[in-house]
Amino acid sequence: MLPQGLIVSCQALPDEPLHSSFIMSKMALAAYEGGAVGIRANSKADIIEIKKEVDLPVIGIVKRDYAHSDVFITATSKEIDELIESNCEVIALDATKQTRPKESLSELVSYIRNKAPNVEIMADISTLEEAKNADELGFDYVGTTLRGYTSYTKGHILYENNYQFLKDVLAHVNAKVIAEGNVITPEMFKDVTDLGVHCTVVGGAITRPKEITKRFINAFDK
């Protein structure tokens, strides 16, 4: 089980300056030394390097684009196989209602349970309906990761209306809830923790210096 507290997402995509499994492993080490209780990471290669560097549970994902589908976070059994080989403790996958490229969500849950019964599963959702569905499918964790990132939730952010969406998810699912997405300040981390989430994933605000720099620069463009 993931411990309660702060999980730091250490990811860099191919077009980003820090794209390197070695660099991500050092980013994870810095997060560990700062007090993180877990890491979220993208790709088998990154996870293997991170696990050499820190003794923390890892939420693993594989981001891969597929034609005719907007699902790109651990979209098929191919990505799940890679994550099982990485020995990550938790596999996270897109649990939205978007059209999937191959297997159904329920088929993927069964696939993980059968192939890796000791691995926990996290649902990345964007709506309350998706959270409830993930809960019914038996996910161990439900995360608000994709709120604002699906076509039908675009424009929404986690902290709008005093975190009402997060409050609704907490009230309607039995799975442990993970706050993720647009948690960009220590105060927000405290806010969502006080609401009762099991843990919180923070990425861009900690591990993406290019984006952090842009936020400072953009302050002058408004």
Swiss-Prot record:
Enzyme class, UniProt record, top EC level: isomerase
SUPFAM superfamilies: Ribulose-phoshate binding barrel
Pathway(s): Amino-sugar metabolism; N-acetylneuraminate degradation; D-fructose 6-phosphate from N-acetylneuraminate: step 3/5
EC number: 5.1.3.9
Keyword line: Carbohydrate metabolism, Isomerase
Pfam families: NanE
Gene Ontology, cellular component aspect: cytosol
GO biological process: carbohydrate metabolic process; N-acetylmannosamine catabolic process; N-acetylneuraminate catabolic process
Protein role: Converts N-acetylmannosamine-6-phosphate (ManNAc-6-P) to N-acetylglucosamine-6-phosphate (GlcNAc-6-P).
Record-linked HAMAP family: ManNAc6P_epimer
Family: Belongs to the NanE family.
Descriptive protein name: Putative N-acetylmannosamine-6-phosphate 2-epimerase
Organism the protein comes from: Staphylococcus saprophyticus subsp. saprophyticus (strain ATCC 15305 / DSM 20229 / NCIMB 8711 / NCTC 7292 / S-41)
Gene that encodes the chain: nanE
